[in-house]
Curated annotation (Swiss-Prot):
Bilayer-crossing regions: 40-68
Stored InterPro entries: Cyt_bc1_su8, Cyt_bc1_su8_sf
Mitochondrial matrix compartment segments: 1-39
Gene for this chain: Uqcrq
Keyword annotations of the record: Acetylation, Electron transport, Membrane, Mitochondrion, Mitochondrion inner membrane, Phosphoprotein, Respiratory chain, Transmembrane, Transmembrane helix, Transport
Functional description taken from the UniProt entry: Component of the ubiquinol-cytochrome c oxidoreductase, a multisubunit transmembrane complex that is part of the mitochondrial electron transport chain which drives oxidative phosphorylation.
Name of the protein: Cytochrome b-c1 complex subunit 8
Length: 82
């Protein structure tokens, strides 16, 4: 009647190759090469990435402190009120 799912149509002049899911490995060299590579890349880029984040954090905390201080009332203005 029809073709099975995955082979629904046939396209001329197109060659496709596939690997069986049983022959694939989900995480090849994940622990032996992947994690050390992440550590190496992090070590190489930390001096380029960290300073802007530190600067942003300092500006952000300073801004929050200034905002909180600007919302408080100044007691010196109300010393002579009765």
């Amino acid at each position: 009647m029809g073709r099975e799912f995955g082979n629904l149509t046939r396209i001329r002049h197109v060659i496709s190759y596939s690997l069986s899911p049983f022959e694939q490995r989900a995480f090849p060299h994940y622990f032996s090469k992947g994690i050390p590579n992440v550590l190496r890349r992090t070590r190489e880029r930390i001096l380029r990435v960290a300073p802007p984040f530190v600067l942003f954090y300092l500006i952000y905390t300073w801004g929050n402190q200034e905002f909180a201080q600007s919302k408080r009332k100044n007691p010196a203005k109300y010393e002579n009120d009765k």
